[in-house]
């Protein structure tokens, strides 16, 4: 792998061959690499896993957050070995190869993490050639010429193109994923800016009937489904770029006092819709053990996070009340509107991977819908 500043990081390639350019970042979760690699929020990113053993349980069809892998590749400390898990269907390296994703093993991932922590997320090219033949100057130039995530709208590239209904509930060891019929439940329309499947599962488990629409759906297209509430999903890229088509729709929904719940990118878009601003973080928050303080009662939730942009707390208008703060750096982790039935969080209450401290937010959304639209 080569960084835009010319630094080279050598390792043992696995997965697909070729080269891919994107932003390299680090993720501190000890488990859940399947969920992480398939999370659409990681589009155009290369993941440096801080935990040394990645791939040891292989890959399967159940522990994924999308139909394909969205991260461009990954960097790991130890070589990928044969999986040891009764649910495994593929070796991790074979899984990456089948989805045209590149891996790099044998890297001092702690040193790379230290570099990224100091210098911030970096543009990089990850390359794999079994013969070890690389045009280093060309790779460096590719990394330097890549525009970067700032100003980039990636939501429409990972979003669904057609609306669909979702009935799958959360997974259990005995029964796998359940199918839940919530025809009498409140109808939630989820706008897909890069939806994770486990968000949809938690909405269903909370009692919602769920319909998913594309990121670029207009206000009329959303309302054609007669929603009782609208969910704004997570997703990749710069929220300010996605806002060009998303914010006008959200503002129209706010005007009719539609109950709204946003997660991650959805949180940022809700903030932009009420006049706040967002910024690119130095290194971002990516892990499954991030403590968040709930301001209403000072309780702490351990959360899963994955974002490289954030909402500027001091830009919030009077009607947007901060509800959660990151205990790592004090950045905004949640907000609630005082004049509209809308709230959002920067972190991932659906986890996958991560703790389940914040599952209650899905129930809160359904309760809000019941209150506003009895």
From Swiss-Prot:
HAMAP family: CPSase_S_chain. InterPro entries: Anth_synth/Amidotransfase (IPR050472), CarbamoylP_synth_ssu (IPR006274), CarbamoylP_synth_ssu_N (IPR002474), CarbP_synth_ssu_N_sf (IPR036480), Class_I_gatase-like (IPR029062), CPSase_GATase1 (IPR035686), GATASE (IPR017926). L-glutamine binds at residues 41, 235, 237, 265, 268, 306, 308-309. Keywords: Amino-acid biosynthesis, Arginine biosynthesis, ATP-binding, Glutamine amidotransferase, Ligase, Nucleotide-binding, Pyrimidine biosynthesis. It is an enzyme of class 6 (ligase). It catalyses: hydrogencarbonate + L-glutamine + 2 ATP + H2O = carbamoyl phosphate + L-glutamate + 2 ADP + phosphate + 2 H(+). This is Carbamoyl phosphate synthase small chain. Pathway: Amino-acid biosynthesis; L-arginine biosynthesis; carbamoyl phosphate from bicarbonate: step 1/1; Pyrimidine metabolism; UMP biosynthesis via de novo pathway; (S)-dihydroorotate from bicarbonate: step 1/3. The active site is at 264 (nucleophile), 348, 350. It holds the Pfam family GATase. GO terms for molecular function: ATP binding; carbamoyl-phosphate synthase (glutamine-hydrolyzing) activity; glutaminase activity.
């Amino acid at each position: 792998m080569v960084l835009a500043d010319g630094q080279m990081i050598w390792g043992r390639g696995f997965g697909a061959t070729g080269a891919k350019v994107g932003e390299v970042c680090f993720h501190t979760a000890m488990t859940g690499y399947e969920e992480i690699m398939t999370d659409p929020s990681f589009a155009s990113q290369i993941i440096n896993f801080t935990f040394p053993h990645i791939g040891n349980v292989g890959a399967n069809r159940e522990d994924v957050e999308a139909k394909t892998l969205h991260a461009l590749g990954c960097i790991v400390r130890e070589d990928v070995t044969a999986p040891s898990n009764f649910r495994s269907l593929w070796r991790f390296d074979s899984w990456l190869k089948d989805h045209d994703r590149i891996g790099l093993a044998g890297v001092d991932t702690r040193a790379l993490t230290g570099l990224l922590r100091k210098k911030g997320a970096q543009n990089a090219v990850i390359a794999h050639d079994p013969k070890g033949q690389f045009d280093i100057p060309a790779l460096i130039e590719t990394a330097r010429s890549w525009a970067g995530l700032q100003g980039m709208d990636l939501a429409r590239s990972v979003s669904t193109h057609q609306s669909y209904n979702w009935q799958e509930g959360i997974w259990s060891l005995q029964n796998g994923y359940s199918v839940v019929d919530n025809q009498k439940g409140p109808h939630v329309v989820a706008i897909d800016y890069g939806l994770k499947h486990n968000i949809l599962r938690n909405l269903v488990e909370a009692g919602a009937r769920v319909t998913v629409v594309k990121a670029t759906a207009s206000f009329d297209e959303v309302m054609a489904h007669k929603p009782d509430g609208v969910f704004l999903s997570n997703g990749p890229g710069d929220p300010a770029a996605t806002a060009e088509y998303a914010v006008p729709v959200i503002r129209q929904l706010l005007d009719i006092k539609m109950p709204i719940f946003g997660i991650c990118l959805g949180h940022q878009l809700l903030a932009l819709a009420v006049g706040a601003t967002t910024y690119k973080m130095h290194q971002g928050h990516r892990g499954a053990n991030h403590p968040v303080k709930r301001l209403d009662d000072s309780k702490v939730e351990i959360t899963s996070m994955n974002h490289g942009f954030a909402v500027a707390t001091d830009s919030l208008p009077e009607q947007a009340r901060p509800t959660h703060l990151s205990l790592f750096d004090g950045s905004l982790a949640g907000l609630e509107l005082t004049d509209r039935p809308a709230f959002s969080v920067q972190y991932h209450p659906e986890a996958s991977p991560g703790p389940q401290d914040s599952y209650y937010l899905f129930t809160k959304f359904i309760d809000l819908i019941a209150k506003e639209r009895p």
